[in-house]
Amino acid sequence: MSERIPIEILEGYRESFNKQEGRKYPCSNQTVVCGIFTDSRNKAIDFMEDKDIIDIRVMHNEIVWRLRNGEKWIWTNWNESHRGYRFYKVAVDKDVDRKLFENMILVYTSFYCCSFEII
């Protein structure tokens, strides 16, 4: 990760997003999921450790968890295109890259996200 966002700014976004009602269902053809934004596969796995997981799919550059409550959490290489996703809940690495945050996380969480965690 290159230029990082100061933790105070991330905390401000967390406060703002956690006040939103969020939108669990899309208004078009997008898929609404939950995303884990970190370069560390192990950090993503640790974050999901205490969740009520019913299914895990591990592929080369992606892990998908399905939870008993119906949520679908994804960890992947976020530097690739993910245009169809909108994020209802996110877990963001405290060392997240500024460019990734501004060009991916903010764009795909606006109006949908109601839970923003810093990991």
Model-based region annotation:
Residues 1-119:
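Short, flexible loop motifs at catalytic/binding sites
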